[in-house]
């Protein structure tokens, strides 16, 4: 079986275990997957995605522009480079996407930041308030070559520390940008 297909099937089985509950507006689904590992042994991160909203924070408190930060990194099929994506928007205007290639050491640095802030301890956490707009909360989705993964989601509040976002913004070379800085 293809490795990518195996990852997709594993994620689907995992998400099927944690997506339960009411789907009407205002309905709240809170779940913590008991089978999700709360630590990751592997150091070989192969894909990473973070969506972090700072719309509920004051810019003075975060030292970041208020907005939604979407940061992604994925190891290329040949394993020679990492494809990175940065998309920042202010919740009203749509941001533009910046894509670039990085060295494979880039994913190791992302993994170090994830371990520093113990993101794996939130693995399997899912909190969804139906009817809220898409631009609130935090989502993390990370996959490792060993088959281990981290997935956590909350569309109501930012449950991970703002310092995590600051360090990732530094690594992804995001400099307090808004869509207007991208020429939008």
Model-derived regions: residue spans:
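Acidic/histidine-rich, surface-exposed loop or edge segments in extracytoplasmic proteins
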Residues: 82-97
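Generic structural motif
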Residues: 48-50, 80-84
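Short, solvent-exposed coil/turn segments at beta-strand boundaries
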Residues: 74-81, 145-146
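Short, surface-exposed charged micro-motifs
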Residues: 70-74, 139
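Short, well-ordered, aromatic-rich surface patches in folded extracellular/luminal domains
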Residues: 3-66, 96-184
């Amino acid at each position: 079986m293809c490795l990518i297909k195996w990852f997709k099937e594993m994620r689907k089985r995992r998400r099927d275990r944690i997506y339960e509950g009411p789907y009407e507006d205002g309905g709240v689904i809170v779940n913590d997957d008991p089978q999700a590992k709360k630590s990751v042994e592997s150091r070989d991160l192969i894909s990473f995605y973070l969506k972090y909203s700072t719309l509920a924070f004051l810019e003075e408190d975060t030292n970041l522009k208020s907005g939604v930060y979407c940061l992604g990194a994925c190891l290329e099929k040949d394993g020679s480079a990492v494809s990175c994506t940065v998309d920042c928007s202010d919740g009203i205007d749509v941001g533009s996407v910046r894509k670039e290639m990085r060295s494979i050491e880039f994913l190791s640095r992302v993994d170090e930041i994830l371990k520093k802030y113990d993101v794996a301890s939130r693995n399997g956490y899912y909190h969804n308030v139906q009817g809220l707009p898409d631009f609130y909360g935090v989502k993390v989705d990370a996959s490792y070559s060993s088959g281990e993964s981290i997935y956590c989601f909350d569309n109501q509040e930012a449950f991970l520390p703002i310092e995590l976002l600051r360090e990732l913004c530094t690594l992804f070379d995001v400099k307090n940008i808004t869509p207007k800085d991208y020429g939008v």
